[in-house]
Amino acid sequence: MVFLTTRLWLRNRLTDRYWRVQEVLKHAQHFRGRKNRCYRLAVRAVTRAFVKCTKARRLKKRNLRTLWINRITAASQEHGLKYPAFIVNLIKCQVELNRKVLVDLAIYEPKTFKSLAALAKRRQQEGFAAALGDGKEPEGIFSRVVQYH
């Protein structure tokens, strides 16, 4: 059996404590000050870094979603639509693109995004026309205004 380094040769002879310390110091290698040399300080710093790393993974998702919404808002306002109306009308048109894809389209393929905005705007206009109707009351419905003769 050939050992290429003294560390590997020592591993068979020393206790596990040495390797636990080395594992912590390996994670603390890039820290400044005594935190990368003193085990006691390194344990605290590494634990704190791991906790922050875990919390940051959730924050990253939240921040990216906010960024995507801001970018879609800006892109849809260029075409005369507000963000909620744009998203709702795309859903009504059964366009199932998520926010990340919509942002990529807005940045890298503006003509495609323009056609999606036109589709959403057309759907919005159809909704307004259906809500207004033709202005006549249907037969058999009493209105609130009662006319006396």
Curated annotation (Swiss-Prot):
GO terms for molecular function: rRNA binding; structural constituent of ribosome. Residues 1-9 form a transit peptide. Gene3D superfamilies: 6.10.160.10, Ribosomal protein L20. One of its GO terms (cellular component) is mitochondrial ribosome. SUPFAM superfamilies: Ribosomal protein L20. Keywords: Mitochondrion, Ribonucleoprotein, Ribosomal protein, Transit peptide. It is found in: Mitochondrion. One of its GO terms (biological process) is mitochondrial translation. The keyword Kinase does not apply. InterPro entries: Ribosomal_bL20 (IPR005813), Ribosomal_protein_bL20_C (IPR035566). Pfam families: Ribosomal_L20. Belongs to the bacterial ribosomal protein bL20 family. NCBIfam families: rplT_bact. Component of the mitochondrial ribosome large subunit (39S) which comprises a 16S rRNA and about 50 distinct proteins. Interacts with OXA1L. This is Large ribosomal subunit protein bL20m. The gene is Mrpl20.
